Amino acid sequence: MNKNSDKTLNIKTFFDKKIPIIFEEIDEKEVADGLCYNPYSKDAKILIDNRLGKRRRLNVLIEEITHAFFYELPEYKVRKFSAELGRVLYNQFLKKTKEK
């Protein structure tokens, strides 16, 4: 088990497919902080680089989950949505808990 997770996280897509979310080091030749393998495939999974900071990890997690649900969307739309949602969640919930 890695340092960022006590258990395996999973999501269930619209078509009830269970997809594991795995936090581990991603090979640098991938040039990615996260990867979503085709959610329609037998080996579907989401990888998130466990070396990321909290805020970046949140945004990448949102982005890869969005890919799993809306795999056909172009990358720029997924990134825009993920960045906006990540910003709102971070500022509303995570940043405020730091201030307390």
Task: Give each language-model segment a name.
Residues 2-3, 7-55, 70-89:
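Active-site scaffold of zinc-dependent metalloenzymes
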Residues 38, 63-65, 77-78, 95:
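General N-terminal targeting signals
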Residues 59-71:
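Active-site recognition of the HExxH zinc-binding catalytic motif
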Residues 60, 80-81, 99:
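Alpha-helix boundary/interfacial micro-motifs
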Residues 91-100:
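Short, positively charged interaction helices/loops
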